Amino acid sequence: MEATSVFWPKLGSQIFLSSSTNLWPLSKLYGFHLTSFPSKPLKHIRLKATNTLTFDDQERIRKFKKLPTSEWTHYGHSISIDVSEMDALRKEIDALKPILKSTLMSFKGIDSTKKRILMIYLLVSLGLAYHFEEEIYETLKMSFENIDKMMDGEDDLYTVSIIFWVFRRHGYHISYGVFQRFKGSNGNFKESLTRDAKGMLSLYEAANLGTTKDFILEEALSFTSSHLESLAASGTCPPHLSVRIRNALGLSQHWNMEMLVPVEFIPFYEQEIEHDEMLLKFAKLSFKLGQLQYLQELKTLTKWYKELDFATNLPPYFRDRIVEHHFLVQAVFFSPQLSRERIMMIQYFTGLALLDDTFDRYASLHEAESLANSLERWAPDQAMDKQPDYLRFVLNFILDTFEEFKRELGPEERSYSVNATIEEFKAAAKANIDLEKWAQADHIPSFEEYMEVGEVEVTVYASLAGIFMSMGKMATKEAFEWLKSRPKLVQYLSIKGRLMNDLMGYEDDMSRGYVTNAVNCYMKQYGVTKEEAFRELYKIVVAANKTLNEEFLSTTGVPHFLLKATIDLARMMTVAYNVNEGFTNPQGKIKEYMTSMFVDQIHI
């Protein structure tokens, strides 16, 4: 019997699972027919229901928008991995790691502590921080106790900005007052700063970690943005710095996915005159190992996805996005050794996306209610036997997937995490049916009414539950209780997710007659144009980002890794929605990002 290799949390360890039982294993397999993107534009198709129904609309014609299948799914089947290359990379990494660790921890004294923090910034930017978590924690804890002494007399814009960025990035509430020294007598930032391109860029990056109370950082963001655009366009900066400035203006490092940063930063660092050759090599080795690990997982996942047989069992209303799921999950589970967490989360996201598409894109209200009722009971309701085959398939897939989670986590005494996640999944289903009732009636509620339901339907709560479940023993019962309490951090993440989804998905919604969204609700309630609604909703997203930063810094009594996972989910959203609705339409920047991770392997 063929064996499938899956890597688990300890770097280099493996477990072999038989193909008949699949990933965890899965008790039932369904398959998928792979096709490429069509050359013609999207079109509406009309599909006649063929299953026996008891409703009056038995012979009704459904109208829905067929989405193109993903070109990436086919790519996953063609992947070839050289395991010996991965082993060789691990050996080189293991040899270099203690040398770099010694370098990081060898700095002593106040000035040397600054150098250590600047090196931490390099480690984060080069994608290496996960190798040195204990050393970074020890350094920042010790340094923050002497922060005033360390910052006293420091007048280099780059140094101050990077130190500020590193501390806030790791949850230390360093005061924005450190930037007061760069203001002139008129209360504005000194114009002389504009001659320091790297300093201006670092100040811009630091300003993106501002809270609702950091007014000086809002000024810094405005000041740096306009001048950096001019610097990048003027040709006075080195070309590699101009590229980095333009990338940062498009998406700041703070809101970028951690594993995407080194895609741009490694080439930048290599062109820096004073780069460290050993650190650069270590970054390339580590990134290459991550790429190969991801590809190995994709080969397994695309095989599993093909065997799910969605195309045979479902009308073509669902988003075929298994590889896109893997890419986005990397936002939370980045390091190569977290293979188990990624795979479990991808299975979970597949169920969430199928649920959303079924409610949002295809099911009649009768069918949607039956599915929601069955999920609430966590078993088929009486009406389910009379529902179309496709709907029973959706329900069975969801129930079977969670049963496999229980089988996987039960021996670890973590069934509570599956049960808690099920409850969040049910809440998402209920919110879906509430929105569906409005949508099918073409009802546009008040903005407040819509957001109350929409913040749950956008599945932030359900996604975080799945993330916590996938973490294994790290996420205790208290983690799920914290999520259940709906803390402010998570509430504002839901606001951000709901609005970004509706802003970027607005044209898609309207093209299929789906009028119940935040834009239309805001337009109706406040009597404004679409353009005005977009502008005001974007302001709410910006304000939500500041609150996220604030809550990340001020929340106490919650493990740091849970707070980081929440912010990482925010980063996933930012990348997915930065230019368009990147999950539904994975073109443009999303395609560039995925190509850099899965196709263009780094040269060492």
Swiss-Prot record:
Binds 3 Mg(2+) or Mn(2+) ions per subunit. The keyword Cytoplasm applies. Its EC number is 4.2.3.-. GO terms for cellular component: cytoplasm. InterPro entries: Isoprenoid_synthase_dom_sf (IPR008949), Terpene_cyclase-like_1_C (IPR034741), Terpene_cyclase_plant_C1 (IPR044814), Terpene_synth_N (IPR001906), Terpene_synth_N_sf (IPR036965), Terpene_synthase-like (IPR050148), Terpene_synthase_metal-bd (IPR005630), Terpenoid_cyclase/PrenylTrfase (IPR008930). Mg(2+) 1 binds at residues 356, 360. Its cofactor is Mg(2+); Mn(2+). It is found in: Cytoplasm. Mg(2+) 3 binds at residues 501, 509. A motif (DDXXD motif) lies at residues 356-360. Pathway: Secondary metabolite biosynthesis; terpenoid biosynthesis. Gene3D superfamilies: Farnesyl Diphosphate Synthase, Terpene synthase, N-terminal domain. SUPFAM superfamilies: Terpenoid cyclases/Protein prenyltransferases, Terpenoid synthases. The keyword Isomerase does not apply. It is an enzyme of class 4 (lyase). One of its GO terms (molecular function) is terpene synthase activity. Keywords: Cytoplasm, Lyase, Magnesium, Manganese, Metal-binding. Mg(2+) 2 binds at residues 356, 360. Belongs to the terpene synthase family. Tpsa subfamily. The Asp-Asp-Xaa-Xaa-Asp/Glu (DDXXD/E) motif is important for the catalytic activity, presumably through binding to Mg(2+). This is Putative terpenoid synthase 7. It comes from Arabidopsis thaliana (Mouse-ear cress). The lineage of its organism: Eukaryota, Viridiplantae, Streptophyta, Embryophyta, Tracheophyta.
